[in-house]
């Protein structure tokens, strides 16, 4: 895995996500047509600075109760937290909601934002919903498919797998950059080169 230095991560975090997309069009022109979110999303905290980190991935459902034993589900949740904790830092959690339509129940709110922040995660990008916005962990960014009031029967399906969130395909350990506009995957091979092409450019 190609890891960036703290200075390079900080430099990328100083850019908004559209600027990163502009740079990718130069250093990896084939990615003009993929690798970023393409559907509208909601941002819980638009005033926060962009986040950039290594992807930790999972998939969820919420419309129906889980079919597995409660003991098994509890152990899976503990294994998932260990997975988040053991990954490279900083991290961004990317969660695909498998329900149709997505967002029936929120995995993310006051509890999960605080747990994940404590495990070194800067924020989440999800096709699902988020809730408890005023009470979520300070400085933790949440970019989601929708806001919602209930968690319904939300549960993990699996984790550490490839996911798709609003048109953006993400593999574990991918470098993800996100802000109020959405998110983009930065290929490790060109991540450093992106910083060479971040001067102001046309937005159209």
Please annotate each region the language model reported:
Residues 31-33, 54-57, 91-94, 121-125, ...:
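Structural motif
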Residues 82-127:
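Extracellular/luminal Protease-associated
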Residues 182-196:
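A short alpha/beta connector and helix-capping loop motif
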